[in-house]
Structure formats: structure tokens, C-alpha cells
Amino acid sequence: EDGKITPDYVVDTGNGQMPMHGRVMKDWNWRRGGYGKLTVTEILEVSSNVGTSYIIDHFYGSNPQKYIDGLRRMSIDQPLHLQIAGEGKPNIRGPKERSYFSKTALPWMSIGYETQVPPLNILTFYNAIANNGVSIRPKFVKAAVKDGEIVKEYPTEVINPKICSDKTLAQIREILQKVVGEGLAKPAGSKQFHVSGKTGTAQISQGAAGYKAGVTNYLVSFCGYFPSEAPKYSMIVSIQKPGPTASGGLMAGSVFSKIAERVYAKDLRL
């Protein structure tokens, strides 16, 4: 959106390990030698942590607040004010909200760490991509009915009328379709229709003990929409899994595919 890269911009991810400000960023396949040179599209297809974090650190490392401000323009950090209790609150803290913003904060934020974004906020964001850039507040109640008559309707509320430019929107929609069609999210796809979306795999912090205590737990997810060409449904699947590293594409993507195909089969108007 800031015009710094295109889908064809190339990053050399090397052997899957990249030193960053005293720490090492790794791709999931670093033990197999990594991916080498990848375009931005390919970085998202294979979920390259190295590629993603390098881009964000390279272009925003000198001004992290600009990156944070860009996220906020897309309203991904906005409370949803849902109709039911128990809503999680997003928390994305930039340099202005911290007494100390380390050099490693930005690259690790770029792959989902050091932030708190509830699944429904992520789904709302992807739904906006499917909805031509219009971000809509999720609602669980369409209308209140008494004795067969509607006594109150709950209209659709717009959170953000345009999360990004039409050019950026077209590019990211094409990439998200390739993530499923050609990338690690193939299990989320269907032979009956095209699916677009993105995988996610994150290690869950064990409270004050951080990421290194006891059994490692992972949150694997897939968020997307279908059919890609004329989106009608958006969905997120999140699974908490203990033990070895898990794959968002394989686990959550497979569940997404099964649900999507059932919905598709029941909706003859698609």
C-alpha cells in the first residue's frame, strides 16, 4: 500500500535462517536448506517467516510507527463491539505505546508475535478483502421477533469503508488465491470451487514463563473466503495443538475445506 514492493519483488531467504538484531529468524524448513530466492507472492504461498520479516524490517525498521499506523488504517486493531459477551480485545502496541521498543520487536510483529489479534478480528479483516475492501462489523442477531413480527432490526454496520486501494486489493486477492491453489494451503481448497486465504501457525506463550516453558503449544489456523471470484462466505478455523510444530494449512485448512464444501453443497444459489 505504501508502494515499496510489488508481488514480484524478490527476497533471498537463503538457507532459511537470517540473523536479525542479535536473534535468528527461521523458516519452518530451515533444516532442509530453506527456500532461497522468493517473490513476495511465493513468500506468502510458503509462509516464509524470513521473507516476511526481512521486508518489514528493511522498509520500516527506521520508522516502526509507520508500519503500525498502516495496520491501524486497515482497522485490524479496532474493537468489534459484538452483540455477545466475551469479546477479545486486539492489542497492537507500537513505539508510542511502549517505554522500550526493541529492534527485534518489528520483525517478530510482522509474523504475528508481540501482538494480540482475536480470531474474529482476523476474520473481519479477511472478510473485508473479500468484500471489495469494505470492513463490516460481525453480527449474530439480524432481528428480534415477537409473536411472528419483527420488533427490532440490527442493520449492517461499516467499520471501515475502504481498508486499502483497489490496486492493492486486487493484488492481495490474487495472491491469496495462489496460496491455496499453489502454496502450503492446498488442503483448504476444493475441486468444486476456488478458495482464497492464508495459513497461520504460532507458538502460544505460557504466560509469565514465555515460549520456553514445558510442553510447546501451537495455534494453527486458516482464514479465507469462497468462491474466490465472487466471494459469498468467509471463515476462520483455529486449532490449539500441543506437541511438535503443526501446520496451519494441513490441519486447519483441511477442516476449512470440509466445512466449505458442505456449505457449498447446501447453497444451490452459489
Predicted regions and their residues:
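Short amphipathic alpha-helical face segments that pack within enzyme cores
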Residues: 119-124, 251-258
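A short acidic/glycine-rich loop-to-helix N-cap element
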Residues: 239-251
